Swiss-Prot record:
Lineage of the organism: Archaea, Methanobacteriati, Methanobacteriota, Stenosarchaea group, Halobacteria
TM region(s), chain numbering: none
Residues at the site labelled Transition state stabilizer: K56
Name of this chain's protein: Crossover junction endodeoxyribonuclease Hjc
Protein keywords: DNA damage, DNA recombination, DNA repair, DNA-binding, Endonuclease, Hydrolase, Magnesium, Metal-binding, Nuclease
BP-aspect Gene Ontology terms: DNA recombination; DNA repair
One Gene Ontology MF term: magnesium ion binding
Residues that coordinate or bind Mg(2+): E11, D41, E54
One Pfam family hit: Hjc
Length: 140
């Protein structure tokens, strides 16, 4: 399966999960391809909080986002009145969410999320959607 098809499938999976959690949610049409404007992959809100989400998936290798991709997400979010979030999912794991400012920035100005970082530091789905919070081992 091509990475684009897999990414599209993962985006739809995230949209369905957010819908089941009570959010009004939509996948931005042609995000990243058929428009000159940079759009987030997913818009979601529950009447109290609104998110513009860039969704990325990987089999286990680190996930990279370009600096421009993250800057465009932050810009859109500010203008739209939403909170910018990066959603990452690794095979056989759940979704984890990050504020763009919490991501590791490479020397080249790109952003990176490793699987172990997502599992240790990412906000889990239940916490993100207002459910029970994740208990982290060794945390305060």
């Amino acid at each position: 399966m091509s990475s684009n098809r897999k990414g599209d499938r993962r985006e739809r999976e995230l949209v369905n999960a957010l819908d089941e959690a009570g959010f009004a949610v939509m996948r931005a049409p042609a995000s990243g391809s058929a428009t000159t404007r940079e759009l987030p992959d997913v818009l979601a809100g529950n009447g109290e909080v609104f998110y513009a989400i860039e969704a990325k998936a990987s089999s286990g290798r680190p996930i990279y986002l370009s600096g421009e991709e993250v800057e465009a997400l932050v810009y859109f979010s500010r203008n739209f009145g939403a909170k910018a979030r990066i959603a990452v999912r690794f095979d056989r794991e759940d979704w984890y969410f990050f504020h763009p400012g919490d991501l590791y920035v490479t020397d080249g100005g790109n952003y990176r999320v490793k699987k172990e970082t997502a599992l240790a530091e990412g906000e889990d789905f239940e916490s993100f959607t207002g459910g029970p919070t994740q208990t982290k081992l060794g945390g305060d």
